[in-house]
Amino acid sequence: MAFKELTLNNFRCFKSTKIELSPGINFFYGKNGSGKTSLLEAIHLCSSGKSFKSSNLQALIAQGEDSFSLKSYDVDKGYILSVTKEKNKSISILVNNTKTTTSRLIREFPSTAIHNNTFSFADASPDFRRKILDRSLFVSDKSFLENWFAYYRCLKQRNSLLKSGSILNIEPWDIKISEEGEKLDLKREDFFKATLVELNILINTIKHSSSVNFLNDIIIDFFPGWDKSSELISIMTNNRFKDLKRRSTTEGPHKADIKFLIGDVDARQILSRGEQKLFSILWCCAQHEVLRKQHNINATLIIDDIKSELDTNTFDIFLELLNTLNNQIIFSCIDDHFSSKIESSFREFKKFHVEQLR
């Protein structure tokens, strides 16, 4: 999927704006408050039904207006997408004039957004890292959502029994949660391993290898949520009384995490903020490469305020990385760092001065 066009009506500071995007690299620049983040927010909303800035979509309606609308065109499948939000009404999502769900939106228009609240995956919560992994599985594996819901339904039932203070009827749920948990774990681990392969390929394409030594030092481990020297059913059975005391299920795929270490130390304690951000970008790109190569899915990478946290060295690595990627990339910055000479070296590059779009 690559967005070809985006039309904004009464969305934040944009009264009526139409943008033609490149299927490759798109760069938005302008001073603070010009609307850079709002444009990226609109693109993300078109691919998820959610804003990465506000949980209140009504706040996105331009001041003095009763609704906002976003329209976009997908170059790969020819889909016409319309997203509308009226005051005091639910969001309306149409694909080719047919009402659809946010689940289909995420699957048909996949994207990942990196912004100031999520720029470091190493510093994020385990829940956030699980969501990034699970979202890629959701868009690439039609059976994953069924597995995911089945596991979490079992988890809810088991936790309900634990909170009641009785484990007399817990055995059937131990069996069921273990069956569903093993399926969920297998899918996660397979995608994680594929992402590692693509990550190493991306790192090896960077010519200034001395500048990325820190990337080679990072050890990345997938923790399934329990000690896999034992089967999950054994963990559930052996943990019954401990879980009863804590009134919740203490181990399982709902506790899964991706851990980033240097030696035996958490990477966030060693890496600079710029190095953490660059690594997060690489990790997202690696996941997108798995989607593209193994599932023929082209996801869009959205990066707000690219220069924030990055120094000259890490920014130069990012520029080098751009030419190795095949998916659509949309990012913003306060200043224009791209001369005509640099622009000509990129594939399908488009640059937008945001003040001129309003």
Spans of features found by a protein language model:
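Nucleotide-state sensing region of NTPase/ATPase domains
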Residues: 47-128, 137-140, 144, 200, ...
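A short, compositionally biased
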Residues: 1-2, 63-68, 85-90, 253-258, ...
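Conserved P-loop NTPase catalytic core
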Residues: 352-358
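Walker B catalytic acidic pair
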Residues: 304-306
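An accessory alpha-helical subdomain
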Residues: 79, 120-209, 223
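Conserved P-loop NTP-binding catalytic core
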Residues: 11, 15-94, 165, 169, ...
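H-loop/switch region of ABC-family ATPase nucleotide-binding domains
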Residues: 332-334
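Conserved NTPase motor "head" modules and their coupling/switch loops across ABC/AAA+ ATPases, GTPases
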Residues: 1-31, 168-300, 309, 313, ...
